[in-house]
């Protein structure tokens, strides 16, 4: 199977998000890469479902709360930018203050 670098990146994010979901389900607090992956994957899947950029910017802030991440992680992530594929093309989605 031949994948483009972009497709490889998407698969890596999805895999990290899957791991983060499992750890979160076990009651573990997420670290920086796990938190970023989980929020990024939620944005990418929302785009694939046909949601708008504005909806995803808003929904991206509800994926995780401070109680879901290790101490100091929320402050380490002022915003997350995700290049997501929408029905009408690829767009950059920025989620400001993703962990509140």
UniProtKB/Swiss-Prot annotation:
Enzyme class label: hydrolase
Keyword field: Cytoplasm, Hydrolase
Main location: cytoplasm
EC number: 3.5.1.5
Keyword Hydrolase: yes
Reactions catalysed: urea + 2 H2O + H(+) = hydrogencarbonate + 2 NH4(+)
Gene Ontology biological-process annotations: urea catabolic process
Record pathway: Nitrogen metabolism; urea degradation; CO(2) and NH(3) from urea (urease route): step 1/1
Top-rank taxon: Bacteria
Subcellular location: Cytoplasm
One GO molecular-function entry: nickel cation binding
Gene3D superfamilies hit by this protein: Urease, gamma-like subunit
One Gene Ontology term, aspect cellular component: cytoplasm
PANTHER family in alphabetical order: UREASE
Family: Belongs to the urease gamma subunit family.
Subunit structure: Heterotrimer of UreA (gamma), UreB (beta) and UreC (alpha) subunits. Three heterotrimers associate to form the active enzyme.
Name the record gives this protein: Urease subunit gamma
Upper classification of the organism: Bacteria, Pseudomonadati, Pseudomonadota, Betaproteobacteria, Burkholderiales
The encoding gene: ureA
């Amino acid at each position: 199977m031949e994948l483009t670098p972009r497709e490889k990146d998407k698969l890596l994010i999805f895999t990290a998000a899957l791991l983060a979901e499992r750890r979160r389900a076990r009651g573990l607090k997420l670290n920086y890469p796990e938190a970023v992956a989980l929020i990024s994957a939620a944005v990418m899947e929302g785009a694939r479902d046909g949601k708008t950029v504005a909806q995803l910017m808003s929904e991206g802030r509800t994926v995780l709360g401070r109680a879901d991440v290790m101490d100091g992680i929320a402050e380490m992530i002022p915003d997350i930018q995700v290049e997501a594929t929408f029905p009408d093309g690829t767009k950059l989605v920025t989620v400001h203050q993703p962990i509140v």
